[in-house]
Amino acid sequence: MLQHTKSAELFEKAKQFIPGGVNSPVRAFKSVGGTPIYMAKGRGAYLTDVDGNSYLDYVGSWGPFILGSMHPRITAALEYTLKNIGTSFGTPIEMEIEIAELLCKIVPSLEMVRMVNSGTEATMSAVRLARGYTGRDKIIKFEGCYHGHGDSFLIKAGSGALTLGAPDSPGVTKGTALDTLNATYNDIESVKLLVEENKNNIAAIIIEPVAGNTGVIPAKPGFLADLRNLCDQNGIVLIFDEVMCGFRVALGGAQSLYGVTPDLTTMGKIIGGGLPVGAFGGKRKIMERVAPLGDVYQAGTLSGNPLALTAGLETLKILMDENPYPELERKAAILEAGFRDNMQKLGLNFVQNRVGSMACLFFTETPVESYASAITADIRKYGKYFHSMLEQGIYLAPSQFEAMFTSSMHTDEDLDKTIKANFNALQIACS
């Protein structure tokens, strides 16, 4: 068995100074049991922990590492910026214009864009902007969709909130909750009903076009187009939260994959290349309401800092130069087929959902199309599965309700190893 002595010691020490011993709840292994693994190094598709154990990484820092960890072009660009430019000035820099222009070129909905420091900042800012633009207060989100830890979004949220078994959080006021309406993912009638019941009061509908924090749930054919039409008919701002799926499922994000253009888009993860970053953008007539041009306030001390922009710019350039998407699709499809074959051999019929290089194996036989069906998954079995995979050197998300990310650095040999480990882990999970 792998030894995790130093990780256990570090976790005990961390709990003295950090709430729960972690800086993000899902990292605490509450959902799967056991002690969090402390990582010491990441290279390519591999992580090494503080006890010297090596793992194939399918978490990818929760999505940013589509090119693997420590890509040589990105590290070289960061080294140049550190040595020759600096870390932050609190002033405009030329690089801000370069990345903004590139994002507007790549993402269909973007005519103007504002850089921020996280996905949460991006979604909070986009919702504030939608409210300012429309003069309305209420928003519609979808049960299980996670849009960061802003108060407006912690109502039937996904990801860590699902892991805790508490979809909302103390500290979110009743007034805030009343302004956040929840619809059922992939159910347009549930959205229409809320719009009708709150006529002329809905500022925005915000959605993950590929839900990635309730496992992975793709939008059904026509669902996003129906939302687009509904928003057009009712003067509602349509926001695509592409913090996770943006630049992951396609270069132009899910909106280019599905051919539906929102009014506003939020981004993060991949556009930071592993450093903290976020962005929101969209139609010029809406974005012109953002201060200092308009009256909707948004600001950030470190927004647009050279380090984060360097990593993001180089990542985008590599994605454009190398077009890894066909190869990512091939690799992710190999894993999906391998897992399916394993389940057939074992007489299992668990659900797999996948869009491009983001996927999820749900420990349920119920088709997963919404929050309600996602939570039929057996988290006890997932916990056993997770620890068996970990023991075999495969690092997955320590939660049933997160995505598995394939990167361009995963080799065919890595995929074979993962499929073999999956066969063993499925047997243990179901024993």
UniProtKB/Swiss-Prot annotation:
CDD domains: OAT_like
Superkingdom of the source species: Bacteria
Catalytic reaction(s) noted: (S)-4-amino-5-oxopentanoate = 5-aminolevulinate
Broad class of where this protein is predominantly found: cytoplasm
Protein localization: Cytoplasm
GO cellular component: cytoplasm
In-chain residues carrying the UniProt-annotated modification N6-(pyridoxal phosphate)lysine: K269
UniProt pathway annotation: Porphyrin-containing compound metabolism; protoporphyrin-IX biosynthesis; 5-aminolevulinate from L-glutamyl-tRNA(Glu): step 2/2; Porphyrin-containing compound metabolism; chlorophyll biosynthesis
Keywords: Chlorophyll biosynthesis, Cytoplasm, Isomerase, Porphyrin biosynthesis, Pyridoxal phosphate
GO biological process, one term: chlorophyll biosynthetic process
Alphabetized GO MF terms: glutamate-1-semialdehyde 2,1-aminomutase activity; pyridoxal phosphate binding; transaminase activity
Swiss-Prot/TrEMBL cofactor(s): pyridoxal 5'-phosphate
EC number: 5.4.3.8
Keyword Cytoplasm in annotation: yes
Keyword Acyltransferase applies: no
HAMAP family (UniProt xref): HemL_aminotrans_3 (MF_00375)
Subunit organization: Homodimer.
Family: Belongs to the class-III pyridoxal-phosphate-dependent aminotransferase family. HemL subfamily.
Protein name: Glutamate-1-semialdehyde 2,1-aminomutase
Gene of this entry: hemL
